[in-house]
């Protein structure tokens, strides 16, 4: 059966990220730290925390030494960004983190040793056996098995997993052929900048030096996201394979992904062809989607 799902990158990826926090907050209410607060994802985290009136006693904002000292406006008040260091997590109960993998591997032990639960948006811990990889609409029960770190999946994985969930539960999924159309924002602030500045240079017929992407992104499609991996797939594509199997606890699901960078500012989209284990009509599939929370 053919199914096309269109989702917003920010809502699905960051919505999943904060939904994990909300799930935890059903059981605890305390002091929050946002790591990577000045980055592209961190700024969206702050917007969502504010728009959802997220409940907490205190909140602190942490970033690298280079960004420490910057000021952030949150809930009408100005906050100074503190430097990320071992002492920064004293009395912190929940850490919401969006950093490069190597930074995550360095600071998460500091936070966990001081009793905090780290919700990590990076890829550093996703495939570690003892770290649950959570999409709240798909496998919320796995969150109870954390040992201080809860991983959030890659954005393209999250989109696909949410669409797969009602079908997988109803009739099982044998195989998924998925194509993604991902915005430059997935590469951070530099990705957006190269799209906008490169587009202007193209229209003005001036030269522009691209650094974030392997080819010009303005008015172009780049069929490679991440580095090249086994069998000609890219690292982004292999994330979709391995992470999805872990989330569903099903190593038998066959996934054939193609990830393409497209010249739009914010949205990621996916087209999915799903082969089910048992018969399912289009009408029945539509009904499953209509009844499923999160779609």
Q: Where are each of the predicted segments found?
A:
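Residue-identity detector for glycine
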Residues: 2-5, 15
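N-terminal Rossmann-like NAD(P) cofactor-binding subdomain of oxidoreductases
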Residues: 26-217, 253-254, 287
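Charged docking surfaces used in two-component/phosphorelay signaling
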Residues: 95, 184-295
């Amino acid at each position: 059966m053919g199914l096309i799902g269109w989702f917003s990158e920010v809502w699905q990826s960051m919505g999943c990220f904060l939904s994990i926090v909300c799930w935890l907050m059903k059981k605890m209410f305390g002091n929050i730290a946002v790591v990577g607060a000045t980055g592209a994802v961190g700024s969206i985290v702050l917007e969502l925390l504010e728009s959802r009136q997220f409940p907490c006693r205190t909140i602190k904002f942490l970033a690298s030494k280079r960004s420490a000292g910057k000021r952030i406006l949150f809930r009408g008040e100005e906050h100074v960004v503190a430097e990320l260091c071992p002492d920064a997590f004293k009395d912190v109960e929940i850490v919401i983190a969006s950093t490069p993998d190597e930074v995550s591997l360095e600071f998460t032990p500091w936070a966990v040793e001081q009793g905090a639960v780290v919700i990590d948006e990076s890829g550093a811990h996703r495939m570690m056996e003892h770290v649950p990889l959570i999409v709240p609409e798909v496998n919320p029960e796995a969150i109870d098995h954390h040992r201080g770190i809860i991983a959030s999946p890659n954005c393209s994985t999250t989109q696909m997993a949410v669409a797969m969930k009602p079908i997988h539960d109803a009739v099982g999924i044998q195989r998924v052929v998925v194509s993604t159309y991902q915005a430059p924002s997935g590469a951070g602030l530099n990705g957006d900048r190269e799209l906008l500045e490169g587009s202007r240079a193209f229209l003005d017929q001036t030269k522009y030096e691209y650094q974030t992407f392997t080819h010009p992104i303005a008015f172009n499609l780049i069929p490679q996201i991440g580095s090249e991996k086994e069998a000609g797939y890219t690292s982004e594509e292999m994330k979709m394979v391995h992470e999805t199997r872990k989330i569903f606890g099903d190593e038998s699901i066959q996934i054939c992904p193609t990830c393409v960078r497209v010249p739009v500012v914010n949205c990621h989209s996916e087209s999915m062809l799903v082969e089910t284990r048992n018969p399912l009509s289009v009408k029945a599939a539509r009904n499953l989607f209509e009844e499923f929370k999160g779609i």
